[in-house]
A protein has these predicted regions:
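Conserved alpha/beta-domain cores
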Residues: 2-219, 227, 239
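Gly/Pro- and small hydrophobic-enriched strand-loop and loop-to-helix capping segments
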Residues: 229-243
Length: 243
């Protein structure tokens, strides 16, 4: 049960807990209608003010994701100051090689691994620290030059490379897709990523019994669920306040 109602943030932002509940219900209903498992919700907190973030963590303390390493550090400090437990942290934004040392072994999942250079550095630091770092390979399903992610035709070789390393655990795939006005227009990009996911799973490239297919954000999580996402990354929809 959420302890948001007994907190200062709960009084100021009651709609956040309501949004979480509504979204979880929508995910369950959409998955049931599509005949697929209910995906896991990973809240993205980059757009939240500090008090909004704390309200969300009281309402849904299970997991959270940040785009930038510095923002993640600040969120961790905020939780410590507030006396709240850390969620399962995911890093979903572009990760610079020189920032890898700050997150390996400290975040549960790096969702944006997209090059041999980056994965090799994650592995190097993980081995030095005696840990295995879970990663997802990010797929640039829209073939957008200004976005991160490996092109679909290069994804299998990158996955095969990751499987040779002892310090990383390849746990699945992630994609964003291009920004589109119609949610259903995302479906071809999600379907493409799902096809790669299914093929890699059949080939034994994922080192987990429950591989992750992370697709869908605030404007696209419904088509992502219908295309079989096992995880959705939602931010803005959790903080909307409609009078």
């Amino acid at each position: 049960m959420s302890n948001l109602a007994n907190s200062p943030e709960g009084e100021a932002f009651p709609y956040i807990a309501q949004n979480v509940g509504t979204l979880l219900d929508t995910l369950a209903e959409t998955a049931k209608a599509a005949g697929v498992p209910v995906p896991r919700l990973i809240p993205v907190t980059k757009s939240a003010a500090p008090d909004e973030f704390l309200a969300l963590m009281r309402a849904y303390p299970e997991a959270a994701a940040e785009n930038r390493v510095q923002a993640w550090k600040e969120r961790c400090e905020l939780l410590e100051t507030a006396g709240l437990p850390a969620p399962e942290w995911h890093l979903i934004g572009s990760l610079q090689v020189n920032k890898v040392k700050y997150v390996v072994g400290k975040v549960a999942l790096i969702q944006s691994a997209d090059s041999e250079k980056l994965i090799r550095e994650i592995d190097r630091i993980a081995v030095a620290r005696g840990v295995r770092q879970d990663i997802l390979i990010e797929i640039n399903s829209g073939r957008e030059p200004d976005k991160g992610g490996v092109l679909p035709e290069n994804a299998e070789s990158l996955a095969t490379f990751a499987r040779t390393l002892s310090g990383v655990r390849l746990s699945g795939l992630m994609t964003m897709g291009p920004v589109l006005p119609d949610p259903d227009a995302y479906r071809p990009y999600f379907a493409l990523t799902r096809e790669l996911f299914d093929r890699f799973a059949a080939a034994g490239l994922f080192e987990t019994d429950s591989p992750i297919l992370s697709m869908g954000m605030s404007d696209s999580y419904l088509p992502a669920v219908r295309e079989g996402a096992t995880m959705v990354r939602v931010g803005r929809a959790l903080f909307r306040h409609e009078n």
